[in-house]
């Protein structure tokens, strides 16, 4: 049954503004999405880095089906022993630095950020939160308070007090981190304005400054995690840099909703020591279906060696996707963006891509950058086809 965009808008709040890219989804599999007119699209957005192992991955689907036959939700988070929660963190810890040893499950990346902020404040007994300019960490009031763009925050004031900003890659701004700073929230690879890599030594200097001031360093790996950059987590590319809290979601669940923050024992225990005993709470956090999906996703990434070819595949896009309207294709692994020339109408480019069967989207703070983040399972033949389709789309605007 088809649903018109107009009918959808009447009942579902805050939906997309460009009718031509609001496809009516029929099914999805691998890197493909089909609409109700049976048109097939190549997904270069992966649900914003959710579908790292592809849509409807058979191993993820089977794990969810098997768990559904046992039980689904039985109790709010943390009250019962649930093996899906334990088995997931037990497996994930095999690939994490030893210091990241305790997990708190939530439902989304925004909630992971919110929980991490609360843990950092409880642990340090400080109030200041520092984030990077032009960064986005979620839609809760705490996350919105970290935004630096007035147009995104003016309707939600008053925001949380004591939220300040530093420049990503600014060594000078690191001096703004002091003994009154509870935490710094940063991305190892920044995404808000288009994919941006840290300059040499900056992440190490950030880590050093946080150590000097007793500040909790929180890494947001909600988009970059789970093999997207060629490592399980982006921070692994940079020697000597380990966060105190790691926020994860999106690609974690292979298409199922789940998120978490993983941190040092002493920091995570501050949530338990809070009185009353609700340092953070979640009814559906650690949902068994989400946890088994996450475990199947992680096992798929590791056992099928999906990360081994990610950088080579990404390099193909960065080297082969050239066009007079493209300024550059930049990124790391399969975490890339197409930066259009300043005089190119990004809306026309976006609509033309969808017309040619390419799903993409713009970066939040830079509409001239189109996302290029297909599933890790994409084949060389599919890469070639997607490159040609994107070139054709740009030819037609």
Regions found by a protein language model. Give the residues of each.
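Conserved N-terminal phosphate-binding loop of PLP-dependent enzymes in the Aspartate aminotransferase
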Residues: 1-397
């Amino acid at each position: 049954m088809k649903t018109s965009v107009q009918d959808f808008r009447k009942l579902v709040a805050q939906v997309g503004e460009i009718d031509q890219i609001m496809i009516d989804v029929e099914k999805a599999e691998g890197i493909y999405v089909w609409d109700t007119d049976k048109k097939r699209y190549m997904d270069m957005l992966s649900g914003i880095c959710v579908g790292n192992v592809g849509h409807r991955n058979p191993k993820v689907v089977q794990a969810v089906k098997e768990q559904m036959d046992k039980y689904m939700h039985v109790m709010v988070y943390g009250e019962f022993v649930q093996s899906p929660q334990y088995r997931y963190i037990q497996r994930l810890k095999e690939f994490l630095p030893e210091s990241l040893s305790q997990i708190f499950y939530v439902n989304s990346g925004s909630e992971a950020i919110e929980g991490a902020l609360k843990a950092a404040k409880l642990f340090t007994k400080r109030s200041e939160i520092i984030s990077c300019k032009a960064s986005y960490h979620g839609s809760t009031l705490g996350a919105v308070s970290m935004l630096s763009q007035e147009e995104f925050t003016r309707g939600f004031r008053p925001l949380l007090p004591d939220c300040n900003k530093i420049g990503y890659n600014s060594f000078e701004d690191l001096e703004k981190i002091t003994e009154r700073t509870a935490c710094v929230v940063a991305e190892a690879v920044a995404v808000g304005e288009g994919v941006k890599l840290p300059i040499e030594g900056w992440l190490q200097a950030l880590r050093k400054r946080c150590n000097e001031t007793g500040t909790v360093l929180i890494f947001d790996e909600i988009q970059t995690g789970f093999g997207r950059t060629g490592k399980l987590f982006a921070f692994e590319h940079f020697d000597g840099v380990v966060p105190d809290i790691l926020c994860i979601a999106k690609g974690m669940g292979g298409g199922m909703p789940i998120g978490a923050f993983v941190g040092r024992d002493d920091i995570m225990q501050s949530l338990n020591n809070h009185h009353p005993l609700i340092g953070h709470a979640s009814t559906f956090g650690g949902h068994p279906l989400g946890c088994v999906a996450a475990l199947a996703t992680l096992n798929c990434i590791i056992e099928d060696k999906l990360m081994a070819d990610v950088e080579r595949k990404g390099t193909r896009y960065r080297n082969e996707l050239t066009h007079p309207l493209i300024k550059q294709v930049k990124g790391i692994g399969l975490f890339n963006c197409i930066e259009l020339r300043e005089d190119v109408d990004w809306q026309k480019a976006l609509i033309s891509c969808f017309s040619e069967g390419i799903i993409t989207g713009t970066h939040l703070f830079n509409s001239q950058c189109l996302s290029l983040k297909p599933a890790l399972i994409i084949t060389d033949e599919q890469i070639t086809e997607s490159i040609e389709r994107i070139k054709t789309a740009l030819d037609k605007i």
